[in-house]
């Protein structure tokens, strides 16, 4: 799934199909809330029947220090997908982008995979609120860079 999000031609085609077929009022860029993490070089994959799985969950302040050293990465694939969509749809159909909330993405980073109770994330929030805040700020910066693309 992430591979198709990171392929500009494929993402643009998937984005434009509903507009062509159903004449909807707007197009939503085909993506996933994990794409900003993938662009930043974080080991993340979507496992069928499970959802997002992180190669290295962020559990400690030193883990937060390590991951927050990464920058937003190369967003040219997202920029190209958006350019292709706009070229096809013109200025009459708005293109909408989206990103995951910093809390949601941070919880995935700490848990390492989907969780119903978020025990590890809640533990970090209470035991090390500064590390949690740094992680959320980093994710917010990733989201901002992604949405700007």
Regions found by a protein language model. Give the residues of each.
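N-terminal basic, low-complexity leaders that serve as flexible interaction/assembly modules and, when applicable
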Residues: 1-48
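Active-site-proximal, glycine-rich beta->alpha crossover segments in alpha/beta enzymes
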Residues: 45-149
